[in-house]
Amino acid sequence: MAKNYYDITLALAGICQSARLVQQLAHQGHCDGDALHVSLNSIIDMNPSSTLAVFGGSEANLRVGLETLLGVLNASSRQGLNAELTRYTLSLMVLERKLSSAKGALDTLGNRINGLQRQLEHFDLQSETLMSAMAAIYVDVISPLGPRIQVTGSPAVLQSPQVQAKVRATLLAGIRAAVLWHQVGGGRLQLMFSRNRLTTQAKQILAHLTPEL
């Protein structure tokens, strides 16, 4: 059966978007707010109608992720910021495999996310309450699966409890995208053997987005 590289690329961009947001948060203490909203909202939608629907139904919502994906796929340097993004992306993929193979872990994750949906009736998605709740899910359900993702950035920034919560919530969104990536036929071998297909697909999607003014 032929693989749907459009859906695979969208889901991969979702992982990369989380990686980029984590990097921004760790170095600057803040990140692209619109992209963060899209990523966090993807955690909540448990029954999407399509891959694109997970990310709000618009390709433009994944602009940050698509641009990051191109950087990761074509990274010639193993040092610096691109190396960080590649490490975060691959680490999220490894953790997703551990999540999917751990008995009962996906059920536990689903139950905890249902709890988030109830909280959303009273609190905003990016409120400290929701951020803390999503971070707690990451700490309780994902972190024990190991190995832990080492987030690098400004030590002063990373000491902030609010930034720590946002980073963990964003990593949870990355896990969500990695689960989706496997569901639509993604696999790590594609990063080696289908790099050109993924690059072409990402460029095609970006090409018909309206330019940012």
UniProtKB/Swiss-Prot annotation:
Domain of life, source organism: Bacteria
Assigned keywords, A-Z: Cell inner membrane, Cell membrane, Coiled coil, Cytoplasm, Membrane
Topology in the lipid bilayer: Peripheral membrane protein
Ranges in a coiled coil: 79-126
Main localization of the protein described in the UniProt heading: cytoplasm
One GO cellular component term: plasma membrane
UniProt-listed Pfam families: DUF489
Transmembrane segments: none
Annotated compartments: Cytoplasm; Cell inner membrane
Alphabetized InterPro entries for the sequence: HflD (IPR007451), HflD-like_sf (IPR035932)
PANTHER family hit by this protein: HIGH FREQUENCY LYSOGENIZATION PROTEIN HFLD
Subunit structure as annotated in this protein's UniProt entry: Interacts with CII protein from phage lambda.
Function recorded in the entry: Negative regulator of phage lambda lysogenization. Contributes to the degradation of the phage regulatory protein CII. Acts probably by holding CII on the membrane surface, away from the target promoters, but close to the FtsH protease.
Family, per entry: Belongs to the HflD family.
Protein's recorded name: High frequency lysogenization protein HflD
Upper lineage: Bacteria, Pseudomonadati, Pseudomonadota, Gammaproteobacteria, Enterobacterales
UniProt gene name: hflD
